[in-house]
Amino acid sequence: MAGVSVESKVSSLVCNLSSTSGLIRRTANPHPNVWGYDFVHSLKSPYTDSSYRERADALVVEIKAMLNAAIAGDGESTITPSAYDTAWVARVPAIDGSARPQFPQTVDWILKNQLKDGSWGIESHFLLSDRLLATLSCVIALFKWNVGDLQVKQGIEFIKSNLELVKDESDQDSLVTDFEIIFPSLLREAQSLSLELPYDLPYIHLLQTKRQERLAKVSREEIYTVPSPLLYSLEGIQDIVEWDRIMDVQGQDGSFLSSPASTACVFIDVKCLEFLNNVMMKLGNFVPCLYPVDLLERLLIVDNIERLGIYRHFEKEINEALDYVYRHWNERGIGWGTRNPIADLETTALGFLLLRLHRYNVSPAVFDNFKDSNGQFFCSTGQLNKDVASMLSLYRASQLAFPGEDILDEAKSFTTKYLREALEKSETSSAWNNKQNLSQEIKYALKTSWHASVARVEAKRYCQVYRPDYARLAKSVYRLPYVNNEKFLELGKLDFNIIQAIHQEEMKTVTSWFRDSGLPLFTFARERPLEFYFLVATGTYEPQYAKCRFLFTKVACLQTVLDDMYDTYGTLDELKLFTEAVRRWDLSFTENLPDYMKLCYKIYYDIVHEVAWEAEKEQGRELVSFFRKGWEDYLLGYYEEAEWLASEYVPSLDEYIKNGITSIGQRILLLSGVLIMDGQLLSQEALEKVDYPGRRVLTELNSLISRLADDTKTYKAEKARGELASSIECYMKDHPECTEEEALAHIYSILEPAVKELTREFLKPDDVPFACKKMLFEETRVTMVIFKDGDGFGVSKLEVKDHIKESLIDPLPL
């Protein structure tokens, strides 16, 4: 403090505190600070070195070029070859009537791309159903053109050696799409060509039975009138197709559900040829299993970039990708590509999730198209199967519910049950999805609510599970190299560590300030400087917001002393004087205060002035009076609670909540950060859209949620200290017949819709800088994490400590 050393303040304070003989003061018995000054200052990150920043900058440039190729195109996509589909295209005869293939380059590709074991497929990913389907398809194509005798022989040997083993992949999640439809059909064709294969295996008969059962459920008439998922596998149902009628459901691009194999199988008119010519012209000598996948690919790219925590580098590219998707969005849902007439649940759910997160106007009514008459959700219209990845996407989308969106509540309930069952199944299964880390994704998603999660921990965890070589299932195993690649992962890890290194330097500044601030002298209060830094830094983590983080942390540390002073240490007479001093905003009035309060008031006065002045510099208008009024309201709320305590008064729940929204202190804390965000101007009109006492906007909802979330985890400890007023106790006073468990359930019934309101306020389009809304929203998310499993501020050595280690202490190995 100016003119007085910290040492003399220490001596004076200790002397005067110990001289209050006969006065019994309550204490919260705070747990000690788990993050020592010496520990924080021992942190030394190598990622402060400029070479890491230079490498990250280079990666950003490389990825931007890659994204421009993927996102700025005209619907094209980058996808790995499908040997299965390429073989079908290779079978198309020349349109001039000569005895040669129309696309001879595909035959050459097949000859050159057989794997060492005699199979065809993606060498890096082995799935037996995929290899068998591709290999048999390639063998038939080569046999038809009487070429590649050696390759045919080796392919047949592979099929003979492995055909019986495919029964071990009989789990639906481990089979390529429509395997039970297509493979028996291919086997019949192979048998008609006298290819020597084991046609009488028990599993083959089982497959044929499954095929018949599935086809028995298909309306033959609907195949020709309504686009059906079976169009994707027409080559597997040639025995039931009326070829002159099937043209009625041909796509505008000439394809059948964007499938090169189906289209090559039909190959009746010039439109089929145009589609195949177009694909061959774009890709050269092979075709993929789907073309195009432009909607799904864009969504997956954006999703991965955001979950890896690197989205701030690619905002322009993300906006272009989502604009493209939104242009093709419709109330029926969307498929994996713009030319696909059938809506797909995974693509639709992911589209809804990302579009809503970016404040596009999308309605959850789209999911009514994916419900059957029993209220169960399925993956695509006309196909009543459920795919784990699709259900996971729907589960994630359901967490973005606004008030009144019952369909999303239904989706959340349904997918939670479905995913739990899938998880139990995966623990005893070697299913493909389990091998691809999907079970880890499910486990984490079910455990961690989006509303109660830490952005930096989420990014770190995703870096740990993200697979650059991730493959997906359709009729073939395929990869999307622009979606999963080494560059994304390297930048994700580098960026996390670089940001963490910046935060560690800021943590040293915070702990140095705290040590010298005088706040540690108040031994009755909790010391949580790092926890409060964590509260803001893990959501508003960008380097340019350092001042916002620092001042937010200062205010939070001050609030903790005030909280414990009003809650436990101060007498009612002392608190009345302190509250009056705050109201008067006059340092001379502090002469009436006890010595410990004099020091507290001086620290308070300096911090409030500092925050107000910094806000004025950032916003360009007078704000000292605004902050003074906010602090006055806040401490008056504290004082009212102190009066309740002194008189053993338990208010009604409504009275408690009205005061608690103010006394929780979240409003003034949030304003001490959001008004000091570098480059983010908040006009008075814009500010009132996120902060208006008594109106359910972001700061009000944050305060309500924080108050009630706090109560659900602290009311027992506070009751043991003699504090009778909590939302639980107040509800029980209003309803004497109810139990504690019923009161707690009622509080949660208030919390849940408030969280939906908060989500709506956060994501609705307006003229408030989105970075400011994000800061307010992210702080709420972290607050909910802190009170998820207990009082994370009061006892910060458990889950909160782990979150701090993950986000601020331990780097990601490169």
From Swiss-Prot:
Pathway: Terpene metabolism; oleoresin biosynthesis. Its cofactor is Mg(2+); Mn(2+). Pfam families: Terpene_synth (PF01397), Terpene_synth_C (PF03936). Expressed in young and mature roots. It comes from the Eukaryota. A motif (DDXXD motif) lies at residues 563-567. Keywords: Lyase, Magnesium, Manganese, Metal-binding. It is an enzyme of class 4 (lyase). It catalyses: (2E,6E)-farnesyl diphosphate = (E,R)-alpha-bisabolene + diphosphate. SUPFAM superfamilies: Terpenoid cyclases/Protein prenyltransferases, Terpenoid synthases. Converts farnesyl diphosphate to alpha-bisabolene. Involved in defensive oleoresin formation in conifers in response to insect attack or other injury. Involved in sesquiterpene (C15) olefins biosynthesis. Belongs to the terpene synthase family. Tpsd subfamily. This is Alpha-bisabolene synthase. It comes from Pseudolarix amabilis (Golden larch). The gene is TPS5.
